[in-house]
Amino acid sequence: MKVVSLFSGAGGLDLGFKKAGHNILWANDIDKDAVATYRENIGNHIVCEDICNIDPVQIPDCDIVIGGFPCQGFSVANMKRHIEDERNELYKQLIRVIKAKNPKFFLAENVKGLMNLAKGKVFEMILADFRGLGYNVQAQVLNAADFGVPQTRQRVIIIGVRNDIDFEYHYPMPTHDKHEKNGLKKWVSVSKALSDLPDPDMPNDIPNHEYSKYKLQFNGYLGHRPLDHDKPAPTVTARGDNKGGVVILPHPNGQRRMSCRELASVQSFPVDFKFSGNRSSIYRQIGNAVPPVLGYAVAKMFNEYKGD
């Protein structure tokens, strides 16, 4: 199906949709490095521009609108009073584009914590906004580890099906399990995910295989505690330390931080996926991304639709 992608970043979600056979007509992001990465790996159909300045007429008609909108600007007060918060404004842009393009379906991805803001009231308002556009809306939390991503990353996936479309979206069934229950494969460990990568300190031609020299100080906080190499990594995030920077997970050997390439592998990006920008920018792009393997899992379920 024809897809329009908003808040595309480096293209993790888009890569999953592309692998599932969908045709991404148009994408958008404001981050120049992320857009350069997207163009290098996915296509030139991405527009580097503030979505607030884009007229929907410039966006092609499509079957699906996809995107992971920022959630930091949300509060009940903001939702009720329409207080202008820069990041809340981006959510309104998603609503604006869906309303203008009227796609058959939409998919919105966000952090699990969005469901708990103001005891769930903000999330209820968001779902109500989507339903007000004329869509049957459902939401479910998926753990990326359950689909083969070497990371316990939980995300809420919101699916909208236009009211006149005779289709029920089914969320993908897990392929992996922590305890290998029901014949499922065992969660992919971080050590397995990194096993094919050479030591970044040795000569190699692996792209983006440099790492931060920021000293490891294990204190129990995310990014500052040893990893269990036999388990998936904790959530890779671009926001999480007390300075608002990128949390760079330590390598399982406990001697250094993960390289950009290693962190990308934990996010399930293929090894030939090349990132643009300086090291900090690349770490941020990786942390903000939807794991492509999870993107593929949710994207392929749209293939069950057999309409026009």
Regions found by a protein language model. Name each.
Residues 38-39:
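Conserved SAM-binding loop
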Residues 199-308:
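C-terminal target-recognition/interaction regions appended to catalytic cores
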Residues 1:
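Nucleotide donor/acceptor-binding cores
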